[in-house]
Swiss-Prot record:
Entry keyword annotation includes Secreted: yes
Family the UniProt entry places it in: Belongs to the frog skin active peptide (FSAP) family. Ranatuerin subfamily.
Record's keyword annotation contains Ribosomal protein: no
Alphabetical list of InterPro entries matching this protein: Antimicrobial_frog_2
Organism (species): Rana boylii
UniProt function note: Antibacterial activity against Gram-positive bacterium S.aureus and Gram-negative bacterium E.coli. Weak hemolytic activity.
Disulfide-bond pairs as recorded: 27-32
GO cellular component terms given for this protein: extracellular region
GO BP of this protein: defense response to bacterium; killing of cells of another organism
Keyword annotations: Amphibian defense peptide, Antibiotic, Antimicrobial, Cytolysis, Disulfide bond, Hemolysis, Secreted
Tissue: Expressed by the skin glands.
Cellular compartments annotated: Secreted
Name of the protein in its database record: Ranatuerin-2BYa
Superkingdom of this protein's organism: Eukaryota
Length: 32
């Protein structure tokens, strides 16, 4: 239903945000 769709969207957004933060963090450590 709509709730599970919303949950899936939220998960995807959280994943993207976490990925972006990880990339920035890696860049600080390894210099990209």
């Amino acid at each position: 239903g709509i709730l599970s769709t919303f949950k899936g969207l939220a998960k995807g957004v959280a994943k993207d945000l976490a990925g972006n933060l990880l990339d920035k963090f890696k860049c600080k450590i390894t210099g990209c």
